[in-house]
Amino acid sequence: MHHTNKKKYGQNFLTDVNLLNKIVTKASITDKNVLEIGPGKGALTKIIVPQAKNVLAYEIDATLKPFLNFENHNNVNIIYDDFLKRDLLKDFDHYFSPNSQLSLIGNLPYYITSPILFKIIDTPQINDATIMIQKEVGMRLLAQPNNKNYNALSVIIQFLFSIEKIQEVKRHMFFPTPKVDSIVIKLTKNNNILPTFLKQFIKFVKNSFKQKRKTLLNNLSCQFLLSKETIIPFFLQHHIPLQIRAEQVTLETFQKLTVKWFIFLNMS
């Protein structure tokens, strides 16, 4: 079968069988309900289907249907549509039993990695995600303070998930060969987060990193429309250096500051 790869969908197919098996092993999907994003020609799907309880895959390119023929298996369904545009709750109600927890697996198109990550965050049924992403993005997710890759996404993802680096993947392991290297990571959700606090945390972190060259003090002043003179007592009270930048602040400190900041705002 012949298929013309479509650049607009970021199609780069992984060809290394050993790595495909490693990804599935690390995902720990035996007898679990699985979502796959972008099955492509089915290289990963063929390994997942015999092991999983049920598989629901989203493939945007309907011309790949001939490669995704699983008529001999009654535990797999493929939706030919854009994952980002789907009402996942409706899909889950249709294909899975109520209150099912799901494991996500996939080689994510580089150009839509962040939107997919935020859709995973917003979908409580997804418990963990074993994903291949652009190495540069992966290094941001794994980055620690005082590292050039450390940003708002690093902090938010590390707050919401425990992150395991599985393997870096060289570009020559794909066909066609992409211009960048990749990395496989596993994200496991922290399910003990109150929705109200999460909303405040994301808002505080995003505003803290709003302009990277500015200090934390300047960013908070600009984004929350407060004078620096109003905010300085808050910094002094909580022993925060006035010249500190967001990329120097640890995840633990961001968590503590979020609580204190919104109390401070309510009192201001």
Curated annotation (Swiss-Prot):
GO molecular function: 16S rRNA (adenine(1518)-N(6)/adenine(1519)-N(6))-dimethyltransferase activity; RNA binding
GO cellular component terms given for this protein: cytosol
UniProt-annotated location(s): Cytoplasm
Keywords in alphabetical order: Cytoplasm, Methyltransferase, RNA-binding, rRNA processing, S-adenosyl-L-methionine, Transferase
Name of the top EC class for this enzyme: transferase
PANTHER family: DIMETHYLADENOSINE TRANSFERASE, DIMETHYLADENOSINE TRANSFERASE-RELATED
Protein name: Ribosomal RNA small subunit methyltransferase A
Species the sequence originates in: Aster yellows witches'-broom phytoplasma (strain AYWB)
Lineage: Bacteria, Bacillati, Mycoplasmatota, Mollicutes, Acholeplasmatales
